[in-house]
């Protein structure tokens, strides 16, 4: 099947069981990527749609690219949409969305994924290493409590050790938000770290 801008699969990270599952993109293509696809994924995978706390284990965080990611389309080739029940909104959290730019969405798309659905809650801190089709959950107790900069350095050094010496590692990209519990780190080989 021709996907016309889509990679054809979405990565579901079940943090409770530490399993990575590939979801077919086809049922979500009609939502167009980004906010539409993220909202559809949220409503399909969120088990309790009445939650009002973004930190609740039933919350689902969807990080979704678009069919234009990695293209030269101005203002569209590098945006990534994040959808779910927000954290820390006053007076209560609610279903919301945000987006960010940079190379994350492009690199995720190049790795063969149209998005990531994160659900559940890990029983201890973990980070998830995504390199193209391979997904590995790593213990992250040594990162817990560190600030953003220290976390970046620690994961970057770990990624270098995990990579082959013949590969280039000069192109690291960090997007880490330790306070809210989510950290992502794509590299040229597309590693994404997610600490919960």
Task: Map each language-model feature to its residues.
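Active-site cavity-forming subdomains of large catalytic enzyme subunits
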Residues: 94-95, 105-196
């Amino acid at each position: 099947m021709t996907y016309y801008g889509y990679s054809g699969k979405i990565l579901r990270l079940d943090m409770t069981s530490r399993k990575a599952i590939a979801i077919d993109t086809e049922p979500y293509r009609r939502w167009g990527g980004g906010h539409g696809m993220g909202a559809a994924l949220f409503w399909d995978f969120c088990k309790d749609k009445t939650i009002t706390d973004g930190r609740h284990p039933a919350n689902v965080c969807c990080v979704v690219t678009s069919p234009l990611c990695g293209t030269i389309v101005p203002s569209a080739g590098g945006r990534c949409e994040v959808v779910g029940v927000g954290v820390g909104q006053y007076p209560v959290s609610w279903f919301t969305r945000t987006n960010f730019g940079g190379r994350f969405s492009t690199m995720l798309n190049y790795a063969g994924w149209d998005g990531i659905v994160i659900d559940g809650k890990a029983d201890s801190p973990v980070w998830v290493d995504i390199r193209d089709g391979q997904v590995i959950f790593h213990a992250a107790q040594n990162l817990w409590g560190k600030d953003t900069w220290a976390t970046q350095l620690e994961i970057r050094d770990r990624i270098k050790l995990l990579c082959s010496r013949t590969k280039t590692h000069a192109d690291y990209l960090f997007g880490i938000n330790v306070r809210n519990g989510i950290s992502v780190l794509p590299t040229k080989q597309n590693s994404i770290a997610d600490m919960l």
